Amino acid sequence: MIVVKFCPKCNSMMVPKKSNGKNVYRCTKCGYEKEVPETTIVVTSKVKHSIKEKTLVLEEEEMPSGAQKIKGVLCPSCKNDEAYFWILQTRRADEPPTRFYKCTKCGKVWREYE
């Protein structure tokens, strides 16, 4: 199950990280951190993709089911701070899913990996 946490200060999406040997959720925009309770297990890994891997192509008007609007994520093209986001399992099941974003202003689509 994937749980998305949002920053209480700026409403941006928070991602799990290690900080000083402890598991925390860190805001991608303002850097706010919240320690994860010891009963919660957070696993993260970095995945390097090769050029030979398949690329997911979305039609311009196509939005996957479950896409949600989020504020506080900056578009790399127009610097708009609002986008749609969705999560897809683009690789093997034992690897983390990929987060996709689509800018509400210019329509640019980009992705983030854990």
From Swiss-Prot:
Chain residues that bind Zn(2+) 1: C7, C10, C27, C30
Highest rank taxon of the organism: Archaea
User: Which keywords does the record carry?
Assistant: Activator, DNA-directed RNA polymerase, Metal-binding, Nucleotidyltransferase, Transcription, Transcription regulation, Transferase, Zinc, Zinc-finger
* Residues annotated as binding Zn(2+) 2: C75, C78, C103, C106
Where do the zinc-finger regions (TFIIS-type) map?
A: 71-111
Q: Please give the residue ranges the record annotates as the region N-ZR.
A: 1-43
Asked if the record carries the keyword Protein biosynthesis, the reply is no
The note describing how and how many cofactors are bound reads: Binds 2 Zn(2+) ions.
Does Phosphoprotein appear among the keywords?
Answer: no
- Annotated region (C-ZR) at 63-114
Identify the GO cellular component terms for this protein.
DNA-directed RNA polymerase complex
- BP term (GO), one: DNA-templated transcription
Give the protein's function.
Answer: Induces RNA cleavage activity in the RNA polymerase. Induces rapid cleavage of a stalled transcription elongation complex with a 2-nucleotide reduction at the 3' end of the nascent RNA. Truncated RNA is able to resume elongation. During transcription elongation it enhances processivity. Involved in transcriptional proofreading and fidelity. Misincorporation of nucleotides during elongation of transcription leads to arrested elongation complexes which are rescued by TFS-promoted removal of a dinucleotide from the 3'-end.
Q: Family per UniProt?
A: Belongs to the archaeal RpoM/eukaryotic RPA12/RPB9/RPC11 RNA polymerase family.
| Domain comment as written in the entry | Has 2 zinc-ribbon domains (N-ZR and C-ZR); functionally important residues Asp-94 and Glu-95 are probably located at the tip of a domain that extends from C-ZR into the RNAP active site. The nature of these residues determines if the protein is involved in stalled transcript cleavage and thus activation (Asp and Glu residues in this protein, TFS1) or in RNAP inhibition (Lys residues in TFS4).
Outline the subunit composition: Interacts with RNA polymerase; probably competes with TFS4 for the same binding site.
Supply the name of the protein: Transcription factor S1
